[in-house]
Regions:
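Glycine-rich phosphate-binding loops that contact phosphosugars or nucleotide phosphates
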Residues: 64-201, 208-214
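Residues at the C-terminal ends
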Residues: 58-59, 154
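A short, well-structured juxtamembrane/interface segment
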Residues: 41-56
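Gly-rich Lys/Arg/Thr-decorated short loops/hinges at beta-loop-alpha junctions or inter-strand turns
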Residues: 27-35, 95-106, 218, 259
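Cofactor-/ligand-binding subdomain signature composed of acidic, glycine-rich
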Residues: 1-38, 42
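Short, amphipathic alpha-helical interaction segments embedded in low-complexity terminal/linker regions
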Residues: 210-294
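EF-Ts-like protein-protein interaction surfaces
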Residues: 187-203, 226-239
Length: 294
C-alpha cells in the first residue's frame, strides 16, 4: 500500500487528549491555519483547471465530481449549491458519491473500494470529450475515484484530481493534479479535518471561478441567482439596486416587470432598453451582462 501522509500521526498533537479545552482548540486552529497556505501553493494548477473546465463548458460540457466519504460529500455539496447560486440547470454540475445517496448521511461499508462502481457511474452519465471530471480523495488512492477518472479519461473527458498527498495514484490518472499537502491530521487519519477543509477550499475556487468566467456574475454580484425563497428574493432586489444605483423601491418595480430576471433588469436599466431588448442582448452575448450593456 502506498505511503499517505494523511494517515500519519501528527507529533504536534500527540498530547491533545490531556489539554484543557481552550488549549485543545488553539492547537486545532493552529493546524487549520496551514490549510490556506497549502492551497495557495496549488494556485497555478487550480488556474489551469479553471481555464480548461471553462473552455469545455462553453462547448456544452458538464462538470462532474466523483469521490467517496467526506470527499464525495464535499463534491455533492458544491454541485448542489450551483443551481441556486449561479442559476445552472440541473445536471450541469454533478456530484457522484460511492454508495449513492445513502452515503450522504451514513457510512456505506466497502463502497470506496469499488473501483468498478466508479467506472460504471461515469459510463452511466455518458461522459464525453466536452465534460470535465474531478476525482476527489484525501489519500489519493481511493479505488472508486480512481475508477471514475480512468473511465472519464477513456471517454476523452478532461480529468482532474484533488488529493492531499503527492505523489498519488489518483493524480497519476489525471491530466491536471491539484494536491494541497496539509500534513498529518490533528486526529490521525481523520481526513474530514484539514484535508476536507483544503478540498472544500479548492472546490469553492474552481466552481466560483468557472462560473465567473461563464458570465454568472456582474462585478461581484451573483446576477444569475434564482430567487426561490424569501431570502433570495430580497437578495435579487438588492443586487439590482446595487448594480444600477437605483433605490430599492424602483429596482424592485423594474425587477418585477422583468419577471424576476436579475440580469434582464440590470441590462434594461443600465442600457436604457426594454426588458424584451435586454433579453435579446443577453442571448446574443451568451449571458454576459457587461457585453449586453454595451
Amino acid at each position: 500500500m502506498e505511503f499517505t501522509l494523511t494517515e500519519e500521526r501528527n507529533p504536534l498533537t500527540s498530547d491533545i487528549d490531556t489539554l484543557p479545552t481552550r488549549d485543545m482548540l488553539t492547537l486545532i486552529n493552529a493546524e487549520d491555519q496551514k490549510v490556506a497556505l497549502a492551497v495557495r501553493g496549488e494556485l497555478p494548477n487550480i488556474a489551469v483547471a479553471v481555464d480548461a473546465i471553462t473552455d469545455r463548458m462553453q462547448r456544452g460540457g458538464r462538470l462532474v465530481y466523483i469521490g467517496a466519504g467526506t470527499s464525495g460529500r464535499l463534491g455533492m455539496l458544491d454541485a448542489s449549491e450551483c443551481p441556486p447560486t449561479f442559476g445552472t440547470p440541473p445536471g450541469l454540475v454533478v456530484g457522484l458519491i460511492a454508495g449513492g445517496s445513502a452515503a450522504l448521511t451514513e457510512a456505506v461499508e466497502g463502497a470506496e473500494d469499488d473501483w468498478q462502481s466508479g467506472r460504471r457511474q461515469i459510463a452511466e452519465l455518458d461522459v464525453n470529450e466536452n465534460d470535465s471530471v474531478i476525482g476527489i480523495a484525501a489519500s489519493g488512492r481511493t479505488p472508486y475515484a480512481i475508477g471514475g477518472l480512468e473511465e472519464a479519461k477513456k471517454r476523452g473527458a478532461l480529468t482532474i484530481s484533488i488529493a492531499c498527498n503527492r505523489p498519488s495514484s489518483l493524480e497519476g490518472r489525471a491530466e491536471i493534479g491539484i494536491a494541497p499537502v496539509v500534513g498529518p491530521e490533528v486526529v490521525s487519519g481523520s481526513t474530514r479535518l484539514k484535508a476536507g477543509t483544503a478540498q472544500k477550499m479548492v472546490l469553492n475556487m474552481i466552481s466560483t471561478a468557472v462560473m465567473i468566467r461563464l458570465g454568472k456574475t456582474y462585478s461581484n454580484l451573483m446576477v444569475d441567482v434564482q430567487p426561490t425563497n424569501i431570502k433570495l428574493r430580497h437578495r435579487a432586489r438588492r443586487i439590482v439596486a446595487e448594480a444600477t444605483g437605483l433605490d430599492l423601491q424602483r429596482a424592485t418595480g423594474i425587477l418585477a416587470a422583468c419577471n424576476g430576471e436579475v440580469k434582464t433588469a440590470i441590462v434594461a436599466i443600465l442600457a436604457g432598453v426594454s426588458p424584451e431588448i435586454a433579453r435579446i442582448r443577453l442571448l446574443e452575448t451568451g449571458g454576459y451582462v457587461r457585453k449586453a450593456i454595451g
